[in-house]
Amino acid sequence: MFSHTNPLHQDVFKSVAQLEAEVVAMTAALLGSKEKASGGQICGNMTSGGTESILLAVKTSRDYMQSKKGITKPEMIIAESAHSAYDKAAQYFNIKVRRVPVNKEFLADVKGFKRCINGNTIMMVGSAPGFPHGLIDPIEELGELASQYGICLHVDLCLGGFVLPFARKLGYPIPPFDFSVKGVTSISTDVHKYGLAPKGTSTVLYRNHEIRKHQFVAVTEWTGGLYISPTMAGSRPGGLVAGAWAAMMSLGLNGYLESTGKIMEVSKKIQKGIDDISGLFVIGKPDMTVVAFGSDAVDIFEVNDIMSSKGWHLNALQRPNSLHICVTLQHTAIYEEFLKDLEDSVNTVKANPGPISGGMAPIYGAAGKMPDRGTVKELLVEFMDSSC
């Protein structure tokens, strides 16, 4: 029904523009827009995904801080656990990245962030949760720091935006993470993850319109007429906007509470199950539905190869070498099978250490040990360049 529509032309496709406004408003309401501390001006747009939302938040923060402080050599501070989309944004927008090691709990090190702040700092990033380990950074402390120094704070809720608000309602001990926290200036939240909307739907939100206006590109001297675009894309698929709206309206509060309850419960069971497997340990104290684990007894990447042969697709992590599972509704009926296969895989590696034929363990292991990261980067580029 909406496949022919284009939100770029709001005057033509008014119904799609209204749907986008409602998706943004509903998402903002989940993330503190109704709280007095938010300031009551939360605004935003839909994007094609978490990476675009992050790119826009970084670009907007850069331009906003340039207008406020005249910063021309911008820097941003991120934890080493922050998503790689921030590195992409830094490359796109000529921003220096100051990457801070995580603390012993694998969280953003607030003291380390503070040491990196200088006259060129435009923003800091906190994750809720971070993609690698499923841990929520200390957003309140980062907010205090951002307020103290007058810089932007972006909270990456791409993964947690449609889980944490409902987990909190269900009684889980979720630390503050949204616009109710003083100092938070922008938030990215994917609707196409736990919001269960079609792929290609995310949102980027701002504390007020003064900040958000720096996201837009307005052109007045084009012979084609006056032009303004809110996001990275010009034309956008209205069908995805409608799909996101339909998903949110169909599920509603009760639907999201039900799905969140199921995946949170299974996530805790998986966490305990991994802890009970000899030779494995869970990294940190997962706040949500991502459970990362490593091993001091076996090569965890060899375990991953065997799990892959059994049909499980886990993410391989580094520093430390580890794996993670991102629990979804599909896992709720088969988590016991997952834990059994994982224990069997660990025992297989214990009994027969060494890479399996065709496995990726040697590649992951070698890449992690190579001191020349430039060479590793070149290998990644060559791999991507060969794809098409």
Model-identified regions with their sequence ranges:
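Short Gly/Ser/Thr- and Asp/Glu-enriched loop/turn motifs at secondary-structure junctions
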Residues: 39-41, 283-290, 318-322
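Active-site phosphate-binding strand-loop segment of PLP-dependent enzymes
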Residues: 108-154
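Pyridoxal 5′-phosphate
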Residues: 57, 103-105, 118, 124-125, ...
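Conserved beta-loop-alpha segment that forms the PLP phosphate-binding cup at the N-terminus of a helix
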Residues: 20, 24, 40-71, 85-89
